[in-house]
């Protein structure tokens, strides 16, 4: 294995500053502001986020998924409930999201607990997807070994021959909603003196969010 270092791979961050006076008092509103900017300014996949879960042995696991809905109740994504991800969530509902937009020198960390969305919500979203995406969700045993891609392609072709009326949302597929207890907004700044602000509730019954500037 060749030895590589990337010490010289660096750049200065200078897109914008983030001051306390700039922040919304509600982190959901602050998230909305930054997401709208990302959708306008970034090239693609502004809604992509890292979802981190923890397995029973304490091992963290991360993967990229797409945010599909967010509101004052939380952040929703869809997946296979029997996948490694789904099994980890069954064992430990605590999870973390991470959004990163390099064009804006921004990232957002969000922590909280996951729960399944109502079945009708999953079904409504499933039927809004393109047919090939619906079929892929139906035939995939996500995270399980498969001998070759040819097997997957054959299963997809077989499924495509079925009448559309037979296409239903699989019981093993649906949405999760993360209910946040923690937000952190990070804005890259020159000389690595980044701006970081944390939103945190002091207790479960506290509706207000405490905002704190953090050292970079």
Curated annotation (Swiss-Prot):
* BP terms from Gene Ontology: pyridoxine biosynthetic process
> Which EC number(s) are documented for this chain?
1.4.3.5
Positions that bind substrate: 10-13, 68, 125, 129, 133, 192-194
Substrates-to-products reaction catalysed: pyridoxamine 5'-phosphate + O2 + H2O = pyridoxal 5'-phosphate + H2O2 + NH4(+); pyridoxine 5'-phosphate + O2 = pyridoxal 5'-phosphate + H2O2
Keyword Ubl conjugation applies: no
Enzyme class, spelled out: oxidoreductase
Pathway(s) this gene product operates in, as recorded in its UniProt entry = Cofactor metabolism; pyridoxal 5'-phosphate salvage; pyridoxal 5'-phosphate from pyridoxamine 5'-phosphate: step 1/1; Cofactor metabolism; pyridoxal 5'-phosphate salvage; pyridoxal 5'-phosphate from pyridoxine 5'-phosphate: step 1/1
* Keyword Membrane applies: no
Which InterPro entries does the UniProt record give? Pyridox_Oxase, Pyridox_Oxase_CS, Pyridox_Oxase_N, Pyridoxamine_oxidase_dimer_C, Split_barrel_FMN-bd
Q: Where does FMN bind?
A: 63-68, 78-79, 85, 107, 142-143, 186, 196
Question: What would be an example GO MF term here?
Answer: pyridoxamine phosphate oxidase activity
Q: Which family does it belong to?
A: Belongs to the pyridoxamine 5'-phosphate oxidase family.
**What does the UniProt record say this protein does?**
Catalyzes the oxidation of either pyridoxine 5'-phosphate (PNP) or pyridoxamine 5'-phosphate (PMP) into pyridoxal 5'-phosphate (PLP).
Subunit and partners: Homodimer.
Under HAMAP family, the record lists: PdxH
Q: Specify the protein name.
A: Pyridoxine/pyridoxamine 5'-phosphate oxidase 1
Per the UniProt record, the source organism is Hydrogenovibrio crunogenus (strain DSM 25203 / XCL-2) (Thiomicrospira crunogena)
């Amino acid at each position: 294995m060749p030895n590589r270092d990337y010490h010289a791979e660096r750049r200065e961050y200078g897109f914008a500053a983030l001051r306390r006076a700039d922040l919304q008092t509600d982190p959901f509103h602050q998230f909305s502001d930054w997401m709208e900017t990302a959708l306008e300014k970034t090239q693609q996949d502004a809604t992509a986020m890292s979802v981190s879960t923890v397995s029973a042995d304490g091992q963290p696991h991360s993967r990229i998924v797409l945010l599909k809905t967010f509101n004052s109740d939380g952040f929703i994504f869809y997946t296979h409930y029997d996948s490694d991800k789904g099994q980890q969530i069954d064992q430990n509902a605590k999870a973390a999201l991470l959004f990163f937009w390099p064009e804006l020198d921004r990232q957002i960390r969000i922590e909280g607990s996951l729960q399944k969305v109502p079945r009708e919500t999953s079904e409504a979203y499933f039927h809004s997807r393109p047919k090939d995406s619906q079929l892929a969700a139906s035939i995939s045993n996500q995270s399980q070994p498969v001998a070759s891609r040819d097997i997957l392609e054959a299963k997809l072709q077989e499924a495509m021959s079925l009448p559309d009326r037979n296409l239903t949302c699989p019981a093993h597929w649906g949405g999760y909603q993360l209910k946040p207890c923690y937000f952190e907004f990070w804005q890259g700044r020159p000389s690595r003196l980044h701006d970081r602000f944390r939103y945190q509730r002091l207790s479960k019954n506290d509706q207000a969010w405490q905002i704190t500037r953090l050292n970079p």
